[in-house]
Amino acid sequence: MAAIINQRVEQGESSMGGAKPALLHRITGHVARINDVILLSKDEGVWTASDDRSVRLYLKRDNDQFWPSIHHFMPVAPTSLYYSEETYKLLVGLINGNVYEFSVADDFNSMTESRKWTCHAGPISGLGFALSSELIFSCSRDKSIVWHCSENSNKMGSYLLENSCTAMVIDLPFVFVGDHGGHVTVLRIVDNQPNLVSKLSAHTNAITSLTWDGNKKVLYSGSSDHLIIMWDIGGGRGEAYELNGHNGKVTTLCAAPAAKRLFSADEHGKLMCWDMNCKRVETPEWKTSDCCQKCNQPFFWNLQAMWQRKVVGLRQHHCRTCGSAVCGSCCDNWTTYPPMGYETKIRICNDCNARMKDNPQNFNLTPLAIPHEIHTGITAMHLQETLGLLVTSGQNRVIMIWDVRSVCSAPSGSQ
């Protein structure tokens, strides 16, 4: 029978205490999937882009309800938004590869088309604006990244990837682009020329979201493989830490640099808040072997050993904490191990199980994340950390605004 280590941990509070996101508002009225949302920081409003071709701005009224102040229809469905509150400029990326720029009125009652770029041959999957260099970036499913000058609309440069672009974040001179192959390409833009710095490869499925912590110089990537990876870009040592808490495709990520938090959401409606102020441990590489590295029993593909010993081959498993290739009998123990990113139970070998039991002081099993069920898949999310507000859009076409101040201000783990 499978053993469970430190069962009390499941009922215990996380390193951030018992804080939970609090629902403040629900916005209904959309008739199609919502592809992107942006929460304003200076006004109480939400931008949305939907498959019904609409771009809407909801503002909070005196009756505490949100109503559309702007309701603009695009030629085809918008897939991505970017809004600059400093310049009142709205960028809208479309499914046909076009990018529109709008000037938004000061009273938020109208928006006027300023420019249009026909720069891609596939759906826009990411937009960005670097105010300091006056560059507008866009990436697309057509595998390309393009940047234009925001002053004269001229194309300043481009870069072609091997796979379709799925997500992008910008912190010039660096541009991070996730693709359908599960890679993150790191570019350095010098005099509008792209230079390949690195390609980060650890995911086994498409990248779905990227977010950047500029304070710690850390990049977070979410993927269809249910995994989140924290890439320590600024550390210079190539360290990467896995975060395992989702049982479905991770759809969107939001970093809260000041609070040292990470918000993630998946296709099943699970919202996670991760404590990124604690010491984490890198996951080991999985070892390869033709026999169990504990009892030496052959695995089912090791025909020679099976024939010589006259035994039936066993199925291979891996201990998640040491990476050993083991049989089922040698790893029938299950536990969480938050320092390594495992917030749900994972399989460990008998040796690691014994070490955890004999030296519990060396294995802190306190949860380092707060899970919250929204009960509908999340399609988009945006955080305004200074306000302590988070907005999500669900597969049920409902927009929810959450108060996350208690989560962000809660005490967290040690460095």
From Swiss-Prot:
- Keyword field contains Zinc-finger: yes
The highest taxon in the source lineage is Eukaryota
Zn finger region (FYVE-type): 286-357
Alphabetized Gene3D superfamilies for the sequence: YVTN repeat-like/Quinoprotein amine dehydrogenase, Zinc/RING finger domain, C3HC4 (zinc finger)
Q: Which InterPro entries match?
A: WD40/YVTN_repeat-like_dom_sf, WD40_repeat_CS, WD40_repeat_dom_sf, WD40_rpt, WDFY1/WDFY2, Znf_FYVE, Znf_FYVE-rel, Znf_FYVE_PHD
For this UniProt record, give its keywords in alphabetical order, as a comma-separated list. Endocytosis, Metal-binding, Repeat, WD repeat, Zinc, Zinc-finger
Q: Does the keyword Repressor apply?
A: no
Query: Which residues does the annotation say bind Zn(2+) 2?
Result: C319, C322, C349, C352
Biological process terms in GO annotation:
endocytosis
Observed effect of gene inactivation? Worms exhibit disruption of coelomocyte endocytosis.
SUPFAM superfamilies from the UniProt entry: FYVE/PHD zinc finger, WD40 repeat-like
One Gene Ontology cellular component term attached to this UniProt record is: early endosome
User: Which molecular-function annotations from GO does this UniProt entry contain?
Assistant: phosphatidylinositol-3-phosphate binding; zinc ion binding
Q: Give the WD repeat ranges.
A: 71-103, 119-148, 202-232, 245-284, 373-403
Which residues make up the binding site for Zn(2+) 1? C292, C295, C327, C330
Describe its function.
Answer: Plays a role in coelomocyte endocytosis.
For this entry, the protein name equals: WD repeat and FYVE domain-containing protein 2
Q: Report the source organism.
A: Caenorhabditis elegans
This protein's gene is called wdfy-2
